[in-house]
């Protein structure tokens, strides 16, 4: 797979006191696998061992983040199977169980970002991997007890939200290890590895719980207990803490006062939020709307969305993130209209094909909108203020990543509200159509319209 567009996230920065110290030709560890001197921009340091250390940390980070996304999406696999296991749940309650992990995951993303400089990247990766044991074990217990109250089920589903926070801390940590010339590729690989977890869990878990006689839902949680322990052990043995990394609260403050942060966050709800929301809801939609079709094919949508994200970044590098984002909202609109036609005619081929278009549009838009961020904050900035612009872009990426994830909550709840109020999912899809058209219009008006402040820039 080709490398995605560069996505710099310099949410950690070097402590000036350490930066002034002589930098050794290779990383030197002290107790606790702390590295006091880290200068990836120095070619001698980078060739002398820096690259090897950075790549090792990246590989282990991808695995831990991948597991986080798997656990985050775990309830999307289990919920459609709960009624068959003896649980009496309304469709509204099922969509609550699907939506609440995204609500929690989005909310903890910014705190997770600041945990890395506070505790160290290695230490926090160990802690966050061990935290995955809690939702995995809780799910394994409650799914074997059909008499469990909905409130307890909802609390256990909420615990899975910790997996959604792993993305933020992982990206913040890896952003510090690589030089600017290689940071985009490294972060793209890190993000892609995480996003793939959503599709992989929907592909693998149904097979795991079906091995042998009957359906064993508890295995959906149990299978991740040794995998999470392995992630913690690998991080303990192979990852590093960088003492020169410190939280950059100022970048978040600068970004929060810039209107483009909130415009892009709004757009990111439509791209990344759509990816998470549709990925979570798709198995339940298939189960309830087309019960004659197996839900085991639901994973295809999430994989399409994850694999098309790098494509969106690459195309945006050539044509500009704003143009590609507008095109992606066009795909999302077409997909939603197609899904409406599929529901109205009860045509599974039309419905499934339309959702593949939705996932494709969400994935491409995910990469393209992300690509817009550094371009927006760099536009029209002279060399003297470039460092401030980079800080603002870093803060924007953190904020947009958190806000965008709320789409994973809004989409399932939109489906639930429409079904409960109108007895059909169609009104929710029409609302999504209007939202995508509005997002396309906002992107055009702010970044493409002739006469707009940034129209002359390649955004």
Where are these regions (language model features)?
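Extracytoplasmic
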Residues: 56-87, 278-283, 411
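Extracytoplasmic gate region of multi-pass secondary transporters
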Residues: 75-80, 258-306, 310, 370, ...
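Central cavity-lining transmembrane alpha-helices of secondary-active solute carriers
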Residues: 96-114, 299-312
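C-terminal ends and interior cores of transmembrane alpha-helices
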Residues: 130-146, 330-346
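Hydrophobic core of transmembrane alpha-helices in multi-pass small-molecule transporters
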Residues: 149-165, 350-366
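Cytoplasmic helix-loop-helix junction between adjacent transmembrane helices
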Residues: 154-193
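Glycine-rich segments within core transmembrane alpha-helices of 12-TM secondary carriers
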Residues: 184-206, 397-411
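Helix-loop-helix hairpin linking two adjacent transmembrane segments in secondary transporters
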Residues: 190-240
